[in-house]
From Swiss-Prot:
It is found in: Plastid, Chloroplast. It comes from Thespesia populnea (Portia tree). Heterohexadecamer of 8 large chains and 8 small chains; disulfide-linked. The disulfide link is formed within the large subunit homodimers. The gene is rbcL. This is Ribulose bisphosphate carboxylase large chain. RuBisCO catalyzes two reactions: the carboxylation of D-ribulose 1,5-bisphosphate, the primary event in carbon dioxide fixation, as well as the oxidative fragmentation of the pentose substrate in the photorespiration process. Both reactions occur simultaneously and in competition at the same active site. InterPro entries: RuBisCO, RuBisCo_large_chain_AS, RuBisCO_lsu_C, RuBisCO_lsu_C_sf, RuBisCO_lsu_fd_N, RuBisCO_lsu_N_sf, RuBisCO_lsuI. It catalyses: 2 (2R)-3-phosphoglycerate + 2 H(+) = D-ribulose 1,5-bisphosphate + CO2 + H2O; D-ribulose 1,5-bisphosphate + O2 = 2-phosphoglycolate + (2R)-3-phosphoglycerate + 2 H(+).
Length: 466
């Protein structure tokens, strides 16, 4: 007779362990689970733990050749979600041995790779991860981080200003470089390739890189400030991506860019290592994130994607605005902004932070606010995001009635006015409009911008509320 009992047994008998004491080395996950009708939450939570670790749908005799107790994921706590029927937060602990060191790719393949199509679940969302110190230390993280970036750029005590060059597609390389020059000359710190500017027939990447480098050097010479343009190195193959990054380094520019979700974590981590070794800053765009993070009950919350990016490596990442055209609830946005920038973040459910996270001195990432913002938003942005951020105005620069350079001037004046007002102890939330109006009295460029955008609002209810 065989030495094990074949057949299908309930997951919860093996994988639901409410008495388990989590270890400091465990990776912890908080899943929002919506079971199918008739499936008890313990079984659903245990199924998630099983299918994302050692389990399969039936008992297999090779289980006897290893120690399941050592390697299995465990659902150790379940709580109902307030105000939602049939939704539960299931906490799962994974032993660290299940994961390859320094690989975000492997971490996600394990934790979210298979389990989201599971039939016993109606929907599943990964809300947060706790990355243990032992695992954090296997990653190099951001190529440089916030402090080193400020030192490289010699810019302190204020947010940095950016602008995405529009129209995003269709300009020739020379006209593109001209727009870059005008924005940098007017007072911005950075300009940006749009996420889908790679190497298209109307503008091949090398032509763009050369004209943008020329624009950067010309603007630096005329302003005495260090300037940058996020040259998008994203490409169809990793080899081609690295070729573009090498070209950027040879041109002596300070920063390149990558679309980390469409490009993939493996490519991103390779690029981050190259940037660290060669003194390039790395700007990260999150194109495709809403496919993954928009639904409340299914997918992955952006805070998980943000944590993963900090591990994989990037110096800037787009993080919503709280005030513009793209979604973002204030407290929740600030929660993952802190996860990107700070060294130690306390658990705080009101901000969507399910676990205390210690980054043990891994460099921080600058959050980038962009999407439908303009000069009237400047006081709110300065107050919400603080100094360690990049504020990016695409249309809010290039849409200025007098042209690109005056648009840049308007944003720089508005920013400097807000920072000065804050440093003098004024309340940006209450006096914001007043501060902008005062500044516009001596800056005709700002006055013109204020007039154009005085009535623009993108007001919809946020999708993501706790």
């Amino acid at each position: 007779s065989v030495g094990f009992k074949a057949g299908v047994k309930e997951y919860k008998l093996t994988y639901y362990t409410p008495e388990y004491e989590v270890k400091d080395t465990d990776i912890l996950a908080a899943f929002r689970v919506t079971p199918q009708p008739g499936v008890p939450p313990e079984e659903a939570g245990a199924a998630v733990a099983a299918e994302s670790s050692t389990g399969t749908w039936t008992t297999v005799w090779t289980d006897g050749l290893t120690s399941l107790d050592r390697y299995k994921g465990r659902c150790y706590h379940i709580e109902p979600v307030l105000g939602e029927e049939d939704q539960y937060i299931c906490y799962v602990a994974y032993p660290l041995d299940l994961f390859e060191e320094g690989s975000v790719t492997n971490m996600f393949t394990s934790i979210v790779g298979n389990v989201f199509g599971f039939k016993a679940l109606r929907a599943l969302r990964l809300e947060d991860l706790r990355i243990p110190i032992a695992y954090v230390k296997t990653f190099e993280g951001p190529p440089h981080g916030i402090q080193v970036e400020r030192d490289k750029l010699n810019k302190y005590g204020r947010p940095l200003l950016g602008c995405t060059i529009k129209p995003k597609l269709g300009l020739s390389a020379k006209n593109y470089g001209r727009a870059v020059y005008e924005c940098l000359r007017g007072g911005l710190d950075f300009t940006k390739d749009d996420e889908n500017v790679n190497s298209q027939p109307f503008m091949r990447w090398r032509d763009r890189f050369l004209f943008c480098a020329e624009a950067i050097y010309k603007a630096q010479a005329e302003t005495g400030e260090i300037k940058g343009h996020y040259l998008n190195a994203t490409a169809g193959t990793c080899e081609e991506m690295m070729k573009r990054a090498v070209c950027a380094r040879e041109l002596g520019v300070p920063i390149v860019m990558h679309d980390y979700l469409t490009g993939g974590f493996t490519a991103n981590t390779s690029l981050a290592h190259y940037c660290r070794d060669n003194g390039l800053l790395l700007h990260i765009h999150r194109a495709m994130h809403a496919v993954i993070d928009r639904q409340k009950n299914h997918g992955m919350h952006f805070r998980v994607l943000a944590k993963a990016l900090r591990m994989s490596g990037g110096d800037h990442i787009h993080a919503g605005t709280v005030v513009g055209k793209l979604e973002g609830e204030r407290d929740i946005t600030l929660g993952f902004v802190d996860l990107l920038r700070d060294d130690f973040i306390e658990k705080d459910r009101s901000r969507g932070i399910y676990f205390t996270q210690d980054w043990v001195s891994m460099p921080g990432v600058l959050p980038v606010a962009s999407g439908g913002i303009h000069v009237w938003h400047m006081p709110a942005l300065t107050e919400i995001f603080g100094d360690d951020s990049v504020l990016q105005f695409g249309g809010g620069t290039l849409g200025h009635p007098w042209g690109n350079a005056p648009g840049a001037v308007a944003n720089r004046v508005a920013l400097e006015a807000c920072v000065q007002a804050r440093n003098e102890g004024r309340d940006l939330a209450r006096e914001g409009n007043e501060i902008i109006r005062e500044a516009s009295k001596w800056s005709p460029e700002l006055a013109a911008a204020c007039e154009v955008w005085k009535a623009i609002k993108f007001e919809f209810d946020a999708v993501d509320n706790l």
